[in-house]
Amino acid sequence: MESKGVVTLDSAGLAQKGGATWSHITSARDQDTLHATRVDAAAADLVLGCDPVVTASKETMLRMHASRTHVALNGHSAPTAAFVQNTDWQNPAQACAAQIAAAVAPGELQTFDAEQVATQLLGNSLFVNPVVLGFAWQKGWIPLSEASLLRAFELNGVQVKANQTAFAWG
């Protein structure tokens, strides 16, 4: 897109709800300058936090740096496996958000209930990811044009209009 180089790495866990998923995306003006598949420690410019527990995990927090990282965070958190075994379980979303806020500069963590937006406007929480992407794009945190991102949904070919709508609502 936009003649930029890009390297991606997707990794998925195997826990409840399919497990945590991380996607490392690195872009540059020149493909030849990209050598690593993972975002280095303290090198993330942006974290799209679609789940607060995963976003506050060691794997994700390691990538953040107070002087450079923006975080768009879905504030909704579903019960984890701990809910089944602990009758005193409390939703950790607020604690996770506080931990993330401590890792970035003031104002660089923006939290909203992306699941509520996706469910109310599109009828399905599966659209949380493009809602969070759209939110971050509207903040100016994604260095791609709207046209390029909408084209990416077309190239993906999966529920194109719904994903584009979710992005627009973000």
Question: Positions of the model-derived regions?
Answer:
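Active-site cofactor/cluster-binding pocket
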Residues: 1-169
